[in-house]
């Protein structure tokens, strides 16, 4: 069952808004054979020009679904967010099922969270390095193809994971030419 944590910035979340979000985003449950118990984090922000920004993050077992949308109409933005999330689920489910068929295993679509790393470095006038954001997360075992899929779903340029084949920490990244690279760590 998907539980919702809905927060509003410069906007009071009314029952009508809450119900609309829960009804629309809650329809994603139909894509799961076993509906996971997860919290969907929804943030709705309004701006001075009356436009709204909706962000939805749903951390599942093997993938994190995330989408954001800016729109002048809050309800239209929620509809667009739902469409984006549905495309992500279908894309992920198709790849997982295709891979499972190749491995002669058939498992229902799995589900769970993984938060990507976000560490930013800023150089000030004295050339001192200041870390302005730090995150911690557990590395999930997966292969490089799953890591690339996770990176694409999150919209990031790199993704750190525990490589199932080598049992080491690896990084996949998007190259400037649009292809992907893999960095594997070795123990000395």
Curated annotation (Swiss-Prot):
GO terms, molecular function: ribosomal small subunit binding
GO cellular component: cytosolic small ribosomal subunit
Keyword Thylakoid: no
Region called Disordered, residue ranges: 93-125
Subcellular location as annotated: Cytoplasm
UniProt xrefs under HAMAP family: HPF (MF_00839)
The protein's assembly and partners: Interacts with 100S ribosomes.
Name by which UniProt lists this protein: Ribosome hibernation promotion factor
Native species: Staphylococcus carnosus (strain TM300)
């Amino acid at each position: 069952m998907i539980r919702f944590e809905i927060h509003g910035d410069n906007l009071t979340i009314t029952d009508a808004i809450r119900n609309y979000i829960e009804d629309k985003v809650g329809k994603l449950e139909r894509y799961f054979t076993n509906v996971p118990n997860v919290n969907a984090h929804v943030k709705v922000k309004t701006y001075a020009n009356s436009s709204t920004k909706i962000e939805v993050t749903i951390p599942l077992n093997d993938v994190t679904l995330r989408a954001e949308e800016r729109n002048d109409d809050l309800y239209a933005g929620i509809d667009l967010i739902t469409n984006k999330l549905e495309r992500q689920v279908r894309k992920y489910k198709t790849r997982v099922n295709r891979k499972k068929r190749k491995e002669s295993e058939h498992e229902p679509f799995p589900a769970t969270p993984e938060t990507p790393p976000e560490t930013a470095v800023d150089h000030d006038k004295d050339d001192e390095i200041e870390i302005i954001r730090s995150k911690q997360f557990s590395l999930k075992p997966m292969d490089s193809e799953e890591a690339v899929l996770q990176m694409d779903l999150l919209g990031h340029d790199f993704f750190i994971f525990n490589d199932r084949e080598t049992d080491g920490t690896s990084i996949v990244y998007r190259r400037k030419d649009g292809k992907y690279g893999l960095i594997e760590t070795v123990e000395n």
